[in-house]
């Protein structure tokens, strides 16, 4: 007669719960552990949890510092939530960028300033694109808006540090000075200040670039240089009416209504534009103003329709 084989043993269920170094406190008769050993196990688990929490806090703090220091991660700080793997990948890309710049990025503050300047310029380009898309009555296939966005994108690609040698990194006091197609021979910085209409019309272009400078000294230098570069465009905007109703009111209230458009047209013809880039101001552009002033007998509605078609 065979003895029934018992596959279970009383010690098999409790062996897995015994930690290393706790064999002395284990009682083989009762199959339980003493109260002192149980409290030690709980204390060890608590200490392990505290150590793990501190380790996670250090990792999260280091990732937050990387997100603040890396320009590409800092750009997406308010737009979307970055994962830890994305922050690490952006850090690796930024280190590769510094190596590609000749290794001077670790110690050269000028190279880092160029990097942040490029980032700010691209952010301003995005603001201009959002502003153009929010304008009412402007179609998406507008040629002037498309030329403006294409021009700004080309300028942003020229500012990329990877495309330039480390020894010739430009850092002028005004961003538009690095663009050869926008430089023009103008009088000194003590030019006429901005008129209210011109400040409102040129806000998508001048203000976005001025805000890219953190210090007030650079902003003041930017304003003076902007007056020298955009002086011909501002004179043409100041001499031409900015809204269609302004010309119509002048023709109604002045007894000599024909002399007002003629003086405006003569002054606009005497000061030709000296820059190749035309701001996105359809109502104040010289070509649109000449066509509108040539037909002064038309109504204000027909004048606005012609400018809108341009």
Swiss-Prot record:
Residues 116-152 form the Orange domain. SUPFAM superfamilies: HLH, helix-loop-helix DNA-binding domain, Orange domain-like. Residues 43-98 form the bHLH domain. Residues 182-192, 261-273 have a biased composition (Low complexity). SMART domains: HLH (SM00353), ORANGE (SM00511). Its main location: nucleus. Residues 293-302 have a biased composition (Polar residues). Transcriptional repressor which functions as a downstream effector of Notch signaling. This is Hairy/enhancer-of-split related with YRPW motif-like protein. The gene is heyl.
